[in-house]
């Protein structure tokens, strides 16, 4: 302990006394106390609470602001960040609208992706998901008529021309999409089958190619077997061989065909028919052997030349017995020799089937122009096209003139509704060296009647032959005036290449457990494919809550949820070799809802309390080390389930600090020592110090949650979260305003000296001329509130010293160096009993409060006179020895109650006000009943003659006064502001009473009846330096509803216009209420400019400069006297023995610092 002499203490205070009077003025700091955890100053702004998720920006000084202003309700939001830009997708489930928002830092844009008015898609949008690895968003669609069917679509969020592409279909419901490090997505849910779309040999509905009038062969009878034309030589579309006796059909395909069979259709009304035919290979003229089923004998037979056709069947099939793979084929048909020149063969249609295909491409000659219903495929075009070069891998057509208006359309023979995939075949350009001549093509797929087409931009400069997926999903069959088709258009000035289109029927893969992994290739010309993980089939998708990749460079997964098997409980690990592994200690004993992977550490949250074997207590949250393979707790966990884990990096004191953030259904987290830290369902863990962070230590307030958005522009801190309020300051029930204009911290340093589980209820300043303060702190323990009185240093964050226990409702009375703690306690019979404790701050001892304890009833108001001897109590009170009613006076030095002369039979005093600085009389505001049954609401007490009497103007007050405040203009001129309830209407009123007794209504631009007012104060302009008004102001505190219906916890009013002073918030983001306003006399640390005030006294007639000059002379004389005594003291001290002073104030401060 340091050694101090009384001499040096006197020297110190003499110097402070001198500096104070020469450089400072006395001012009053103001503290607002109430039920709040954060606040804004001179602002009532708060966050939009309509959205389930929002986006915020934090500046370097720590303040938060809303980044995106949207007004959608019932919304889902996800985001994707790509190359420093943020893309936000908003789903309004009620309106069935999906919007894409982007460019928030420059020119914000909003683009509609889906809407109920957009008829391009069937079903209802049920959910959206965003890929955090690639700039893709996904949407799931469900169908009212197919409740067990879900479609998944996706789109690139960076494209201004959004192209929606079908991703997958499942038979069942999709719950979640998890995006993994190996460019894949895990789809989980309750489904049994999934359509892979990547099968190249699936059932083929139709396959057709481009057809030009300028065909490859000059023979007018040649036909393209992949397109459809009509033989217009006969109105009945029948072939007439009478002139030559032979019809030769030369058919070619623009791709190699593995021919399987030929089908001949007979024309039912024909009397004659084709009798014989041969199939010939045009390359060498050889006849191809065929087999067929003889309808007359029932036996299978073989033929080559003059294969016989039978006309009594609708159709007849002939199979290629030795296989035939080629681009072309020729069919030569002969009559029966009896036909005349005008007869016709009764053959209506001819079809060619590929091997392993369930459907066909056709050449039926039965399109609509021929008078038939049109059950065949066809193609059409506009513009000029030329044949490909001879070196091409297959014959194709290319647009002759770049930039010319052109189009190509393909009409498949789809007769019934189905789900399919449409693919465009692009011939490779390296074979004929045409890559530089090719550009892009726009593909529009018209899949259903009255629906907008699905559009895709396709790059045609493909090195090798490949199929490109244009569309997957529903395909409507022929209906009234509609058939599905594909339209190709050149993009910009590109030369369009056209070849063929194929339509594949969707095939499904069995997924019995509802969990499948899919490759999410971002190559638009490739299809996604299923990744086989046999080990994953041991887990059900409906039991999975999270799947996360590990950051070890391999494709390793943690999978969690609500399951139990041979690999452990609720969490398993799958390595890169597709082997499942259990976690140590048999996993966790409850469901796991979320995983967050950070380096070697993985954080788990859920509804578990221990490891699976019960050996390690975790309490809803755990950390797992991949290296040591050990579980560890975070402090002592939380008091409720954790639902989400992420990272949150925040600016604190101008530096970025990184935390692991947790969200869930909890309101406390526990330190390793067992201390509880209050939260609002969101808390931060510091992995460096391995400790929980209390919100007020961050320097700003959070009523909700904030998570980092990785990949966004590093010059900004952007977060995803939901804050029900945005406040600049975090605190525990207190906001402090200093008269020092340089002090704008608003949070007293002693707040952070208290443990986070202690809430500040009241403060007082019992120590004269020093920085010590008394604080009433409360805490909740086992649903019971306990409190204590602490001493702390108002200028240093020294750990406070606990003095004595108290009640949570206790309040302070200060008499110089004596602190009185009192509380209004109600017993089981609702009888109020007051408890008093007196503590002397100089002797550190308790005083006698027996006489004080004789006061009965509820205390509403307490003031002390300037002698620190008389305590004035107001309330619903009585004291037997003095006979006081409602208003009682306790003389502290004599420890007795003063007898007051009055004729009241009942009284309840709400406010006590000194009338002027002479301390000779005071106003008593409340409700009073005289022995004559008359009622008053404002009385005056004269201290000199000890009487209570009516005052001028009181009869005009409309009802009981709840609060009163007095503004003094001079010794005899003042105004009293009265707030109360009217007797006639029970509405609240605000009136002003002047010193002459005149009373008038005082209107402010607030909603008085909707407001809760707990304090009314008059302040001078220098008392709260942050208020930009150089005039006296009225401050209303509580919960004030302003004229625009916004709320503030305290407002300042000038000329009857009110503006927010303090907007406080509770833990849940609701508006906080100020309960009490405490003023402290303090020294200003910087010189203040004093404004001269002229007096009202005529016999002086001069400004108060005279008083100031006289005061300065007196101070100078006093300083000379004290300086002389100091010289004497120095000589005495030099020749004297030095003795320790153990009870001086400095040593007391040192004691606090060491505790």
Swiss-Prot record:
Major subcellular site: membrane
The membrane-topology field of this record reads: Single-pass type I membrane protein
Matches recorded under InterPro entries: Rax2-like_C (IPR024982), Rax2-like_second (IPR048266), Rax2-like_third (IPR048265)
Keyword check for Glycoprotein, yes or no: yes
User: Any idea where this protein resides?
Assistant: Cell membrane
Q: Residue ranges, Extracellular compartment?
A: 28-1105
Question: Which keywords does this Swiss-Prot/TrEMBL entry list?
Answer: Cell cycle, Cell division, Cell membrane, Glycoprotein, Membrane, Signal, Transmembrane, Transmembrane helix
Pfam families according to UniProt? Rax2 (PF12768), Rax2_2 (PF20842), Rax2_3 (PF20843)
Is Iron included in the keywords of this UniProt record? Answer: no
Q: Per the record, what ranges lie on the membrane's Cytoplasmic side?
A: 1127-1155
What transmembrane ranges does the database entry give?
1106-1126
One GO biological process term: establishment or maintenance of bipolar cell polarity
Q: Which GO CC annotations does the UniProt entry carry?
A: endoplasmic reticulum; plasma membrane of growing cell tip
Q: Which residues form the signal peptide?
A: 1-27
Q: Which residues carry attached sugars according to the database record?
A: 44, 61, 103, 118, 124, 156, 161, 182, 190, 213, 224, 306, 391, 413, 419, 510, 519, 554, 562, 607, 630, 713, 722, 743, 769, 793, 807, 824, 840, 848, 876, 893, 899, 916, 945, 1009, 1030, 1055
Quaternary assembly: Interacts with for3 and tea1.
* Task performed by this protein: Controls cell polarity, through the G1 phase of mitosis, via regulation of for3 localization. Required for actin cable formation where it directs the spatial distribution of the actin cables.
For this entry, the protein name equals Polarized growth protein rax2
Species source reads Schizosaccharomyces pombe (strain 972 / ATCC 24843)
């Amino acid at each position: 302990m340091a050694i101090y002499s009384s001499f040096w203490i006197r020297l110190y205070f003499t110097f402070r006394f001198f500096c104070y009077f020469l450089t400072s003025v006395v001012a009053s700091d103001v503290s607002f106390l109430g039920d709040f955890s954060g606040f804004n100053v001179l602002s009532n702004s708060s966050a939009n609470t309509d959205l389930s998720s929002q986006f915020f920006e934090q500046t370097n000084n720590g303040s938060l602001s809303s980044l995106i202003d949207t007004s959608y309700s019932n919304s889902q939001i996800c985001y994707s960040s790509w190359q420093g830009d943020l893309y936000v997708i908003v789903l309004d489930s009620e309106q069935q609208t999906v919007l894409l928002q982007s460019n928030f830092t420059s020119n914000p844009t909003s683009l509609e992706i889906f809407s109920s008015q957009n008829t391009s898609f069937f079903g209802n949008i049920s959910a959206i998901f965003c890929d955090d690895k690639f700039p893709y968003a996904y949407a799931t669609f469900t169908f009212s008529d197919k409740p067990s069917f879900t479609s998944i679509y996706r789109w690139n969020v960076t494209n201004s021309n959004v192209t929606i592409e079908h991703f997958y279909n499942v038979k069942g419901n999709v719950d979640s999409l998890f995006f993994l490090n190996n460019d894949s997505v895990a789809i989980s849910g309750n489904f049994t089958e999934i359509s892979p779309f990547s099968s190249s040999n699936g059932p083929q509905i139709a396959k057709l190619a481009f057809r030009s009038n300028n065909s490859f062969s000059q023979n007018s009878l040649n036909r393209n077997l992949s397109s459809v034309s009509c033989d217009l030589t006969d109105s009945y579309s029948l072939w007439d061989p009478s002139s030559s006796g032979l019809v030769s059909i030369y058919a070619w395909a623009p791709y190699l065909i593995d021919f399987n069979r030929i089908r001949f259709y007979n024309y039912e009304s024909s009397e004659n028919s084709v009798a014989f035919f041969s199939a010939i290979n045009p390359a060498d003229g050889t006849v191809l052997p065929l087999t067929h089923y003889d309808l007359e004998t029932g036996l299978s037979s073989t033929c080559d030349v003059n294969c016989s056709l039978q006309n009594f069947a609708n159709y007849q099939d002939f199979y290629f017995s030795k296989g035939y793979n080629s681009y072309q084929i020729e069919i030569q048909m002969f009559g029966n020799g009896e036909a005349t020149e005008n007869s016709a063969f009764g053959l209506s249609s001819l079809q060619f089937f590929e091997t392993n295909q369930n459907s066909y491409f056709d050449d039926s000659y039965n399109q609509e122009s021929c008078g038939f219903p049109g059950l065949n495929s066809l193609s059409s075009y506009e513009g000029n096209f030329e044949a490909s070069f001879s070196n091409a891998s297959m014959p194709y057509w290319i647009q002759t003139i770049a930039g010319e208006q052109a189009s190509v359309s393909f009409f498949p023979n789809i007769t019934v509704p189905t789900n399919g995939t449409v693919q465009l075949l692009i011939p490779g350009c390296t074979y004929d060296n045409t890559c530089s001549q090719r550009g892009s093509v726009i593909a529009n797929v018209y899949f259903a009647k009255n629906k907008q087409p699905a559009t895709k931009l396709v790059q045609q400069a493909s090195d090798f032959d490949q199929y490109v997926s244009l569309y997957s999903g529903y395909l409507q069959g022929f209906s009234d005036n509609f058939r599905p088709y594909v339209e190709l258009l050149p993009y910009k000035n590109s030369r369009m290449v056209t070849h063929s289109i194929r339509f594949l029927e969707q095939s499904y893969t069995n997924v019995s457990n509802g969990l499948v992994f899919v490759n999410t290739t971002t190559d638009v010309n490739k299809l996604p494919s299923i990744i086989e993980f046999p080990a994953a089939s041991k887990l059900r998708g409906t039991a999975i809550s999270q799947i996360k990749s590990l950051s070890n460079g391999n494709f390793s997964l943690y999978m969690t949820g609500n399951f139990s098997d041979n690999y452990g409980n609720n969490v398993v690990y799958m390595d890169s070799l597709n082997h499942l592994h259990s976690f140590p200690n048999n996993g966790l004993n409850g469901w796991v809802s979320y995983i967050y992977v950070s380096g070697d550490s993985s954080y788990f949250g859920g509804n578990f309390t221990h490891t699976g074997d019960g050996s390690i207590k975790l309490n809803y949250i755990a950390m797992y080390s991949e290296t040591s393979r050990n579980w560890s707790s975070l402090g002592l966990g939380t008091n409720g389930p954790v639902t989400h884990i992420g990272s949150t990096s925040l600016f604190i004191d101008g530096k970025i600090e990184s935390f692991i953030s947790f969200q869930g259904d909890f309101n406390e987290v526990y330190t390793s020592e067992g201390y509880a830290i209050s939260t609002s369902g969101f808390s931060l863990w510091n992995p460096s110090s391995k400790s929980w962070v209390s919100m007020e230590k961050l320097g700003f307030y959070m009523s909700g949650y904030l998570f980092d958005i990785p990949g966004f522009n590093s010059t900004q801190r952007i977060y995803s979260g939901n804050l029900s309020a945005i406040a600049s300051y975090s605190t525990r029930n207190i906001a402090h305003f200093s008269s020092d204009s340089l002090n704008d911290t608003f949070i007293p340093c002693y707040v952070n000296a208290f443990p986070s589980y202690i809430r500040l209820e009241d403060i007082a300043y019992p120590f004269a001329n020093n920085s010590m303060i008394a604080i009433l702190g409360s805490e909740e323990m086992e649903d019971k509130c306990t409190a204590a009185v602490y001493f702390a240093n108002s200028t240093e964050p020294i750990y406070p010293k606990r003095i004595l226990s108290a009640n949570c409702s206790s309040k302070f009375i200060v008499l110089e160096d004596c602190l009185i703690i009192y509380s209004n306690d109600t017993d089981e019979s609702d009888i109020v009993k007051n408890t008093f404790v007196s503590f002397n701050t100089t002797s550190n001892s308790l005083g006698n409060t027996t006489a004080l304890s004789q006061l009965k009833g509820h205390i509403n108001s307490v003031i002390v006179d300037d002698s620190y001897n008389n305590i004035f109590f107001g309330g619903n009170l009585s004291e037997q020895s003095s006979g006081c009613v409602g208003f009682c006076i306790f003389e502290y030095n004599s420890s007795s109650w003063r007898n007051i002369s009055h004729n009241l039979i009942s009284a309840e005093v709400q406010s006590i006000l000194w009338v002027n600085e002479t301390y000779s009389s005071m106003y008593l505001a409340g409700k009073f009943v005289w022995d004559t049954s008359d009622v008053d609401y404002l009385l005056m007490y004269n201290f000199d003659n000890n009487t209570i009497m009516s005052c001028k103007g009181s009869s005009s007050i409309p009802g009981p006064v709840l609060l009163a405040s007095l503004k003094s203009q001079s010794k005899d001129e003042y105004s009293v502001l009265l707030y109360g309830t009217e007797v006639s209407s029970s509405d609240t009123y605000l009136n002003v009473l002047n010193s002459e007794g005149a009373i008038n209504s005082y209107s402010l631009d607030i909603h008085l009846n909707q407001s809760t007012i707990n304090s009314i104060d008059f302040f001078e302009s220098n008392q709260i330096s942050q208020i930009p008004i150089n005039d006296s102001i009225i401050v209303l505190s509580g919960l004030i509803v302003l004229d625009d219906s916004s709320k503030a916890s305290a407002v300042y009013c000038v000329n009857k216009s009110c503006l927010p002073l303090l907007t406080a918030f509770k833990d849940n983001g609701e508006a906080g209420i100020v309960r009490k306003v405490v003023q402290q006399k303090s020294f200003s640390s910087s010189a203040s400019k004093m404004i001269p005030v002229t007096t009202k006294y005529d016999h002086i007639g001069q400004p108060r400069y005279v008083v100031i000059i006289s005061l300065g002379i007196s101070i100078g004389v006093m300083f000379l006297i004290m300086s002389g005594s100091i010289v004497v003291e120095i000589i005495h001290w030099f020749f004297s023995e030095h003795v320790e002073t153990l009870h001086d104030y400095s040593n007391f401060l040192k004691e606090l610092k060491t505790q």
